UniProtKB/Swiss-Prot annotation:
Family statement: Belongs to the LolA family.
Encoding gene (name): lolA
Signal sequence annotation: 1-21
GO biological process, one term: lipoprotein transport
Provenance organism: Ectopseudomonas mendocina (strain ymp) (Pseudomonas mendocina)
Protein name: Outer-membrane lipoprotein carrier protein
Length: 208
């Protein structure tokens, strides 16, 4: 009986060590791919589906990211909307409503997915359980938040030929948001003024 217990403990220890090694390898690989880009600019296409697969929304636009923590997410189809962060504040501008919402940037990666691409990559291991699979030129990472109050249940990041290709977020009710990145450019000069926002005259301002 003692021998069986020892064998079971040994098997369990081996399983835990293997899982830890796999996660360390996944973290190292993801950190490597994210760290290679100090700036990213791309066209994006975003599709949101409910749990049954019914389309809820389709949008498209342009994004610009710069480390550490700067991003500009400009939706131009079907209706314009602009999300800008200078690393401390976030401005959300809706031209149709002539409304600007201002709030402090939530530095938690589980609440601000854009920071996965533009923030401090050293925080990834602290915030997520990470798994990955690699085949040919494609690498897929599955990130599951450790925090219970995360805005999503899981996030998939895919790279093709070391370039960011697409992202998928799944929330607690099964809603899926698929984002495809097109014409991706890395490490090209990006003007800092893109990450500031001047409030248009006459716009309503909501401070949160």
């Amino acid at each position: 009986m003692r021998v069986i217990r020892l064998l079971m403990l040994a098997a369990l220890s081996f399983t835990l060590l293997t899982a830890q090694a796999d996660e360390e390898a996944a973290t190292k690989r993801l950190t490597e791919l994210l760290s290679q880009a100090q700036t990213i600019s791309a066209r994006f296409s975003q599709l949101t589906l409910d749990a049954s697969g019914t389309q809820l929304q389709e949008t498209a636009g342009q994004l610009v990211l710069k480390r550490p923590g700067l991003f500009r997410w400009h939706t131009d189809e079907p209706m314009e909307q602009l999300l800008v962060s200078n690393g401390q504040k976030v401005w959300l501008y809706d031209p149709d409503l002539e409304q600007v919402t201002i709030q402090s940037l939530d530095q938690r990666l589980t609440h601000t997915p854009a920071l996965l691409l533009s923030g401090d990559v050293s925080q990834i291991r602290e915030n997520f359980e990470i798994d990955y699979k690699e085949g040919g030129s494609v690498v897929d990472f599955i990130l599951k938040p450790k925090a219970k109050d995360s805005l999503f249940d899981s996030l998939r990041l895919s790279f093709r030929n070391r370039m960011l290709n697409d992202m998928q977020l799944i929330d607690s009710i099964g809603q899926r948001t698929n984002i495809l990145f097109l014409n991706v450019k890395m490490n090209e000069p990006v003007e800092d003024h893109l990450f500031t926002f001047d409030i248009p005259e006459g716009a309503d301002v909501i401070q949160e």
